[in-house]
Amino acid sequence: MVPGIDRLLAATPVRFLAARAIWWPAQRTLFVADVHLGKAETFSALGVPVPAGATRSTLQRLIALVDACDAGTLVILGDLLHARAAHSDAVLGPLESALRRRPALRVCLVRGNHDDRAGDPPEALGIEMLDDAHRMGPFELWHHPTDRERGRDPLGAAAPERPDSGHRLAGHLHPAVRLRGRASQGVRLPCFCICAHQTILPAFGDFTGAASIERVPGETLLAIADDRLFELSDR
């Protein structure tokens, strides 16, 4: 089993993985967010210098994690593809090959803002397309989180309080926390943001960037350093 930190979300045992994913063992389901396949190729086509091989290494990490967990379902919480330019043989060919070799794997994608611009993946890939608020057990699957401080949705409206609403799993923010040491030195680490009503996952992709956040009261951050997780909370 892939090492990580075991916690309860909505009274459900899950494991937070330093590989930037959440594992739900009872349902053999792996959650990731913000994969952004094809981002490097998109930037390169615009003449922007980018690291070579980012899409390949991201896909390799994702498939290796699926295999290590023996996942039956892979849920991507938005932004699988970065832009329409990602609909190329160079990007989709390796993805199609990996999925073809794993016919029993169910792959679900919650449409994110980049997916809206890129367009849905080809039907031949067999990826199930989901809209925001899709319910999976005790969880609601979203791309955008609610406002972490005020419990509001990304457009500024009050977050709905429904008696049947589940614990929201979301991405989009690419959250990272800055840890400061001596002599004003610091390091920025990707992190999970966990509170009573939602969990925000860090970006899975290798070439995605990150947004520095500050922990808000009542929230736990799980920072990722290499293959280790560190908890930052009120305790």
Predicted segments with their positions:
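Extended recognition/assembly regions associated with phosphoester-bond processing machinery
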Residues: 1-77, 82-235
